[in-house]
From Swiss-Prot:
Species lineage: Bacteria, Bacillati, Bacillota, Bacilli, Bacillales
Protein name (record): SPbeta prophage-derived uncharacterized protein YotF
Length: 25
């Protein structure tokens, strides 16, 4: 599960300003 968390964290940081709505969905 650590891998998923890390990947999600990085992905969220990258698209936290652009695709935040898509990331949450």
């Amino acid at each position: 599960m650590e891998n998923v968390m890390s990947w999600f964290n990085i992905d969220f940081e990258i698209k936290s300003d652009n695709n935040i709505d898509k990331t949450l969905l």
